[in-house]
Amino acid sequence: MSMQKMNRFHWHLTEDQGWRIEIKKHPKLTEIGSMRKETIINRYSAAIPGIYDGTPYGGFYTQEEIKEIVAYAKERYITIIPEVDLPGHMLAALATYPELGCTGGPYEVGTR
């Protein structure tokens, strides 16, 4: 980032396609919400059907890993701007806690 003279890192931690931050009071967010059944591998549009790889994907950052990354960035004068994208883009959270939705579900972690 420094080579490009950038000192702000916008860290997108939640999305329809996965919940990527450990919340210790809500472990199901990473047990369920961090996993998706497959990933789209082409450019998606209404005119082009999605092509998927069929490979489950998942992962998340632990609170300890996030602390390490924040410290690393701070040493390099990089400001991290975390984003938890709620109430929009909530499929990963709704797949975990469907009772929070207003349509009755069912919900699954997004793939596109």
Where are these regions (language model features)?
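Substrate-binding cleft of carbohydrate-active enzyme catalytic domains
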Residues: M1-R112
